Swiss-Prot record:
Entry keyword annotation includes Endoplasmic reticulum: yes
InterPro entries (UniProt xref): MESD
Main location: endoplasmic reticulum
Cross-referenced PROSITE patterns: ER_TARGET
Region (Disordered): 48-78
Gene Ontology annotations for the cellular component aspect, listed alphabetically: apical part of cell; cytoplasm; endomembrane system; endoplasmic reticulum; endoplasmic reticulum lumen
Placement of sequence motif Prevents secretion from ER: 177-180
Purpose: Chaperone specifically assisting the folding of beta-propeller/EGF modules within the family of low-density lipoprotein receptors (LDLRs). Acts as a modulator of the Wg pathway, since some LDLRs are coreceptors for the canonical Wnt pathway.
Organism from which the protein derives: Drosophila melanogaster (Fruit fly)
Record protein name field: LDLR chaperone boca
Subunit structure: Monomer. Interacts with Arrow and Yolkless.
Protein family membership: Belongs to the MESD family.
Keywords assigned by UniProt, alphabetized: Chaperone, Endoplasmic reticulum, Signal, Wnt signaling pathway
């Protein structure tokens, strides 16, 4: 019986000693009801929560907090700004717009772009596809350099009207020119 009591006391001791503040020593913001917390209070609470955590590895950080990869400009052709753009997007998420020719229904465009997406996957180019209009889709690439390889494939397709990367339009080979 005494050993149980001693074990119980030993188990409860860390819980009692682990309390960070005594009631009278708490800061004013910590005495508030949680429903009355301001953004600054919540930010302070988050900082306390994360103060003892180890920093995340570079690949675990959100994309906007990751360090920029070093660009090797010695291998680039200075006459091609496209190559510079391609290298600068390595490891970064990039969205491209892809348009389908003609006046297709949403289902028809969905089928065509799904076929293109599967062809890209078969070529080891990872792209997510989102339909944004009846004849337009967004292809999202986790590695931005793959977007230019995908562009080369897509503009060769029979029903591709054009691909837009970084506000630059690349017309499809089989797309008819719009006459003014």
């Amino acid at each position: 019986m005494q050993t149980r009591l001693v074990l119980l006391l030993l188990a409860l001791t860390p819980l009692v000693l682990a309390k960070k503040f005594k009631e009278e020593e708490k800061p004013a913001w910590a005495k508030k009801d949680i429903r009355d917390y301001s953004e600054a209070d919540l930010e302070r609470l988050l900082d306390q929560w994360e103060e003892d955590e180890e920093p995340l590895e570079d690949d675990e950080l959100p994309e906007h907090l990751r360090p920029q990869p070093k660009l090797d400009l010695s291998n680039l052709d200075s006459k091609s700004p496209e190559d510079l753009l391609k290298v600068s997007k390595k490891g970064r998420t990039l969205m491209t717009f892809v348009s389908v020719t003609g006046n297709p229904t949403r289902e028809e465009s969905d089928t065509i772009t799904k076929l293109w997406q599967t062809s890209l996957w078969n070529n080891h180019i990872q792209a997510e596809r989102y339909m944004v209009d009846d004849n337009r889709a967004i292809f999202l690439f986790k590695d931005g350099t793959q977007a230019w390889d995908a562009k080369d494939f897509l503009i060769e397709q029979e029903r591709c009207k054009g691909v837009t990367i970084e506000n630059k339009e690349y017309p499809g080979v089989n797309a008819k020119k719009d006459e003014l």
